[in-house]
């Protein structure tokens, strides 16, 4: 084997070892992303919702800043109810379809049904709520 091939093989092995320490993105978030794109007709990238207001993104506190932020708080609360019922919303996969920009759940029972309902309701809410650029990446220390 050529020395260059050995270096490439070594680099691949080392990078794979390092990648094992990176936590995977929860599986359900891929579905939620697709639901959001279904409902908003792809008009706004999902990352715009990841750091918006006091509730859109990781965690949340205080009073929502507007209708879109209220959608995120409702979604957080919905996931909280699902967790109280023994579900793991960020890891629960479910069956759904997009018909004429309306996400519809096909899952019929248990955690799949409740988590899908949380995501579908939020995706529809996001699509209907106005997006205010001033509320993107706000200082969340003001969220009281």
Swiss-Prot record:
SMART domains in alphabetical order: PA2c (SM00085)
Binding residues annotated for Ca(2+), in chain numbering: 55, 57, 59, 76
Highest taxon of the lineage: Eukaryota
Reactions that this protein is recorded to catalyse: a 1,2-diacyl-sn-glycero-3-phosphocholine + H2O = a 1-acyl-sn-glycero-3-phosphocholine + a fatty acid + H(+)
EC assignment: 3.1.1.4
Cysteine pairs bridged by disulfides in the record: 38-98, 54-143, 56-72, 71-125, 78-118, 87-111, 105-116
Family: Belongs to the phospholipase A2 family. Group I subfamily. D49 sub-subfamily.
Role of this protein: PLA2 catalyzes the calcium-dependent hydrolysis of the 2-acyl groups in 3-sn-phosphoglycerides.
Protein name: Acidic phospholipase A2
Organism: Aipysurus laevis
Organism placement in taxonomy: Eukaryota, Metazoa, Chordata, Craniata, Vertebrata
């Amino acid at each position: 084997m050529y020395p260059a091939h050995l270096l490439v093989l070594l680099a691949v092995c080392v990078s794979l070892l390092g990648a094992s320490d990176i936590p995977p993105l929860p599986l359900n978030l891929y579905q939620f992303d697709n639901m959001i794109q279904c409902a908003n007709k792809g008009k706004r990238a999902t990352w715009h919702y990841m750091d918006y207001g006091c509730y859109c993104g990781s965690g949340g506190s205080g009073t929502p800043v507007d209708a879109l932020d209220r959608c995120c708080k409702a979604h957080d609360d919905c996931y909280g109810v699902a967790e109280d019922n023994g579900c793991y919303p960020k890891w629960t996969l479910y069956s759904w379809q997009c018909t004429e920009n309306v996400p519809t759940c096909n899952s019929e029972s248990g955690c799949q049904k409740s988590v899908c309902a949380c995501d579908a309701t939020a995706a529809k809410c996001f699509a209907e709520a106005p997006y205010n650029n001033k509320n993107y990446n706000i200082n969340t220390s003001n969220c009281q």
